Design a protein with these regions (language model features):
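Short loop/helix-cap segments at secondary-structure boundaries that form the rim of catalytic
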Residues: 32-38, 150-154
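Catalytic cysteine-centered active loop of the rhodanese-like fold, especially the PTP/DSP P-loop
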Residues: 49-96
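Flexible, polar/low-complexity N-terminal or interdomain linker segments that lie immediately upstream
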Residues: 1-36, 105-126, 132, 255-259
């Protein structure tokens, strides 16, 4: 595959799911002179690619861009590819993206979020929702329950999934529902995922046939990972796959049909 991707092809990919991880890798002086970025882009230095490459979700494609799509973007792309990532660079860089009439937006510092340690369902689902629909660069912290409010106040973070905050359980709804409601994110696929999350998180497994499976997978991940951020990394894949099912695969079935298999093998 050619490592270059055109702006129009990137635009189509960003509208698909899962979208690529998009990274602005302009050198610092170039970025300081123009602090506009493509919507959804992370900001990383090309000189430190060895460090931040480990942050990239390995199951998602990654697209980098520099000013004009020359050595900076191509070099970062090659470094990511050498680590086994499906990386591409934007042909023509940010300049070509704009020349084709595509929008940029001012760079903003990552939002910060804090909740209780040892997440299971809501405290993984909410970060997934934030990263995919609100702030791709968001930072997450897990601390003991007694320390959540003090951490939020001292570190400029927003607390969630604890009582008496904006993003919390209300009646039968869980914190995932609160994020969807406050950010007006609802659409059919996400509403279906919210029903599954709510059922698994609130012991209402009868609400969604998929909820027992999500609960089992979540408890299994918790048993596998003592590090909450390691669990978050792989929990993101769980929710990517569930959301993909909600978007595209609800009517698909699977079973064992030996006669069809035998007929196909002899055709």
């Amino acid at each position: 595959m050619d490592a270059a991707i055109t702006p129009i092809a990137l635009k189509h990919q960003l509208a698909a799911f899962p979208p690529p991880t998009l990274v602005d890798v302009r050198r610092q002086p170039a970025f300081d002179a123009d602090r506009e970025v493509i919507r959804g882009a992370l900001r990383r230095l090309p000189e430190t690619v060895d460090t931040w490459a480990a942050e990239i979700d390995p199951w998602r494609p990654v697209v980098v861009y520099c000013v004009r799509g020359h050595e900076v973007g191509q070099g970062a792309c090659a470094a990511l590819r050498s680590r086994g990532l499906a990386a591409r660079y934007v042909a023509g860089g940010l300049e070509q993206w704009r020349a084709e009439g595509n929008a940029t937006q001012p760079f903003a510092a990552p939002t910060r979020w804090v909740t209780r340690e040892r997440p299971k369902i809501d405290r993984i689902a909410c970060p997934w929702l934030i990263r995919r629909f609100i702030d791709p660069a968001a930072e997450f912290f897990y601390v003991p329950n007694a320390e959540v409010r003090a951490f939020a106040a001292g570190e400029g973070a927003t607390a969630y999934d604890i009582p008496d905050v904006d993003y919390a359980h209300v009646g039968p709804d869980c914190s995932f529902d609160a994020f969807i409601r406050r950010h007006k994110l609802g659409h059919p696929a996400l509403d279906e995922l919210a029903r599954i999350v709510r059922a698994a998180d609130t012991s209402a497994l009868h609400l969604a046939a998929q909820a027992p499976g999500l609960l089992a997978a979540s408890l299994g991940l918790s048993a596998m990972f003592a590090d909450d951020h390691a669990m978050l990394k792989w929990g993101m894949l769980v929710y990517d796959s569930l959301y993909a099912w909600c978007r595209e695969a609800q009517t698909e079935t699977h079973g064992w049909y030996p006669e069809k298999l035998r007929a196909g093998a002899t055709a």
